[in-house]
Amino acid sequence: SYSNEMSVVADTIGGIDVAEAFHILHMDKRWTGKPAAMSTYVYPGCGYGGYCLPKDTNALYAVTKTAGFDAQILKNVIATNDHMPEFIADKIFRHIGDNKEQTIGILGLSFKPGSDDVRDTPSAKIVRELNRRGYNNIIGYDPVAIDEFKRKYTDLTISYVTSLDEVTTKADSLVITTAWPEFKDIDKKVNKPVVDCRYMN
């Protein structure tokens, strides 16, 4: 949540390379070794997702508040992550403008790479926010999670393609929402706007 908030801060202030800032942070020797593989958690993205982290954070906050303590960090962790889809939709708008006829390609549907788990995935929240703003020409691609996403999120206006080549060809702009390795350097391979919400490139 801190890293996501820092991406908003960097974007708001301007002139800050948030990816470089976090690469420098990760050079601290206290982040190395086992079991301290924390660098993947302390990096900006689309907000948390998956089954455990959102549920457990909300539960911990609720239990703590019921017990009489309004835990501000937990409260702000929830608020920051809940705000990310709106922030990312604003970022997409700044890159592609108000042309709602253009096709937006969503790169990644699972909540993390290496998994087909789409529970509480940021991709669904971002697509929902884009739909709410009138962007309905959306195509999604994921190496493994298309079927799961399609089954779970029937309320979204989105179609699907089965290859990276197809989404990069059909879309007018691309949005990276899951850090799959195959999306690395996609901005150098296509001549169209790429909104890198995972700060891979």
Model-derived regions, located:
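Structural/interface elements that position substrates and couple domains in central-metabolism enzymes
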Residues: 1-201
